[in-house]
Amino acid sequence: MAEHGAHITTASVVDDQPSIFEVVAQDSLMSAVRPALQHVVKVLAESNPAHFGFFWRWFDEIFTLLDLLLQQHYLSKTSASFSENFYGLKRIVMGDQHKLQRLANAGLPKQQFMKSIMFLVLLPYLKVKLEKLVSSLREEDEYSIHPPSSRWKRFYRAFLAAYPFVNMAWEGWFLVQQLRYILGKAQHHSPLLRLAGVRLGRLTVQDIQALEHKPAEASMMQLPAGSIGEKIKSALKKAVGGVALSLSTGLSVGVFFLQFLEWWYSSENQETIKSLTALPTPPPPVHLDYNSDSPLLPKMKTVCPLCRKNRVNDTVLATSGYVFCYRCVFHYVRSHQACPITGYPTEVQHLIKLYSPEN
């Protein structure tokens, strides 16, 4: 009875097909790495904007570049992405007969390799940028930055109205595919795998042995390059491989650390939280008025530090506590991603409008 239930749970179409729990776990792995790294970079940028502000402003591009190196390394060396290899899975080209399947260390054919790179690296980057664009447009629409009769405003309002339905259809497509995978009606838990022309399978004993012996064989079979171009190409390959290997090692350690943190915080009980929140409130910082005579600050407290006029639509920056006109600080933060006075990294969502009794 238990065996029958296990077979229903895995819903295997083929013998090496992983269970839904394995494929969902590997999907959630990289989606947890991005926000974790983003939080680390944000903390560093807030503590030292001069040195780490660049990494915060260009986080998406830097992360995508590192992700490209990492996924390229794993797809060419193990026929799997980093998260798939972490859970002992590999990508199998659709249409291959079971007897003719390639070992994992052979890598993917060029067509499937390029499609996999596109769906693993490029598509998530575009999705993140689209979500940020939608968030920015909603901010502008909420505070009416553009004139009501603007053609551009009518266009992006229509875009904002349609986006939730498009996003719901996209997520529903993935949900339906996962349900079909659970019921054994599909070999792919994700539509992107089908578009890439591959499916996921477990690593076999032969795959593991080939992956373990490949580094030793590669080091023994290295031949001296003939021309200068070949030497440069070989050096670049070694450099990229070294960076990818360092990233994979660091990510493996980081993943275990993230899992430890999840366990640590999930094990906290309510008594511990209450004891921490019951501690007395610390005194205010003594350095808040240190820069009160800064030339950037006007002497009149009702004057905006940017336009040097009486403030209109008072807005405070959550990152620094200074108050500006909404329009002034909105355009400044959107252009510079920093507080005009302190230089702290700041985003549009850090703007808080104030409503005084006089208004």
Curated annotation (Swiss-Prot):
The keyword Oxidoreductase does not apply. The keyword Membrane applies. Residues 1-19, 77-109, 184-249 are peroxisomal matrix. It is found in: Peroxisome membrane. SUPFAM superfamilies: RING/U-box. Keywords: Membrane, Metal-binding, Peroxisome, Protein transport, Transmembrane, Transmembrane helix, Transport, Ubl conjugation pathway, Zinc, Zinc-finger. Its main location: membrane. GO terms for biological process: cellular response to reactive oxygen species; peroxisome organization; protein import into peroxisome matrix; protein import into peroxisome matrix, receptor recycling; protein monoubiquitination; protein polyubiquitination. Pathway: Protein modification; protein ubiquitination. One of its GO terms (cellular component) is peroxisomal importomer complex. GO terms for molecular function: ubiquitin ligase activator activity; ubiquitin-protein transferase activity; zinc ion binding. It is a multi-pass membrane protein. A zinc finger (RING-type) spans 304-343. CDD domains: mRING_PEX12. Residues 48-51, 140-144, 278-359 are cytoplasmic. Zn(2+) binds at C304, C307, C325, C328. The chain crosses the membrane at residues 20-47, 52-76, 110-139, 145-183, 250-277. InterPro entries: PEX12 (IPR017375), Pex_N (IPR006845), Znf_RING/FYVE/PHD (IPR013083). Component of the PEX2-PEX10-PEX12 retrotranslocation channel, composed of PEX2, PEX10 and PEX12. Interacts with PEX19 via its cytoplasmic domain. Belongs to the pex2/pex10/pex12 family. The three subunits of the retrotranslocation channel (PEX2, PEX10 and PEX12) coassemble in the membrane into a channel with an open 10 Angstrom pore. The RING-type zinc-fingers that catalyze PEX5 receptor ubiquitination are positioned above the pore on the cytosolic side of the complex. The RING-type zinc-finger is degenerated and only coordinates one zinc ions, preventing E3 ubiquitin-protein ligase activity. This is Peroxisome assembly protein 12. The lineage of its organism: Eukaryota, Metazoa, Chordata, Craniata, Vertebrata.
